[in-house]
Design a protein with these regions (language model features):
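Flexible, low-complexity linker and terminal segments
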Residues: 95-232
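Thiamine diphosphate
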Residues: 1-98, 103-105, 124-126, 191-192, ...
């Protein structure tokens, strides 16, 4: 489908999720944007390359889309891929609607290129196996090949890895600040005080809003970007 409608975009299947992650990472090192898609169990296979990509950093935007399967509709287990993102110390996004899934992808690439880190975008079965009309935007122009001339940080020898890891740790306050300013995190309009509130994310936020919590006097905090915002 992609090759038929956008032949300038290269897409392919890989032997497994680890090789897919490595291929996408290689394109990112060369300056191109890349997307790698897998299920939650595939994150186990890709874990080595995935975690190390946070330490090497990226050049062109790199987004990892992980589809989790709560209740095991078509999987051998349940996993929460957000723990992989937390362990790797990279930004995580979780859309609550089809429109948000579309919009978040562009945002994810911008965030990846700004922070020079891969971004994990997590979806779940009930969102992935659904349809909805979405408002589309103009296509992003492709970025040209632009290999980084300083390539030592792509090689994770211990001396380099220690330096890169320290850089990743130092970026964490920036990532928290980004979450605090994210258009996808925020409190629903609510006046007055309440004894009960709801914190929701992803498709669960949709389920909460279907019950019109505002009419019940219940404020709802929506959190769709991690690390968790810390400002009150």
């Amino acid at each position: 489908f992609i090759q038929g409608h956008a032949p300038e975009v290269r897409s392919r299947w890989c032997t497994n999720e680890k090789t897919a992650m490595e291929a996408a990472l290689g394109m990112s090192y060369a300056g191109k944007r890349a997307l790698v898609c897998m299920k939650h169990v595939g994150m186990n296979v890709a874990a080595d390359a995935f975690v190390n990509s946070a330490i090497t950093g990226v050049n062109g935007g790199l987004v990892v889309l992980a589809a989790d399967d709560p209740s095991m509709h078509s999987s051998q287990n349940e996993q929460d891929s957000r723990f992989y993102g937390k362990f790797a110390m990279i930004p995580i996004l979780e859309p609550s609607t089809q429109q948000e899934a579309y919009d978040m992808m562009k945002y994810a690439y911008a965030l990846s290129e700004e922070k020079k880190l891969p971004v994990l975008l997590r979806v779940v079965t009930r969102l992935a196996h659904s349809r909805a009309g979405v408002v589309v935007n103009d296509l992003m122009p492709q970025n040209a090949l632009n290999p980084d001339q300083e390539r030592t940080h792509w090689v994770l020898l211990p001396a380099i890895a220690r330096r890169q890891y320290a850089s990743l740790v130092a970026k964490q306050p920036e990532l928290v600040e980004s979450s605090e300013n994210s258009p996808y995190n925020g409190m629903n309009a609510f006046e007055g005080k309440a004894k009960l509130g709801v914190i929701a994310c992803g498709i669960a936020y949709n389920y909460v809003m279907e019950n019109d919590p505002q009419s019940l006097g219940i404020p709802v905090l929506k959190v769709s970007q991690y690390p968790l915002p810390e400002a009150s």
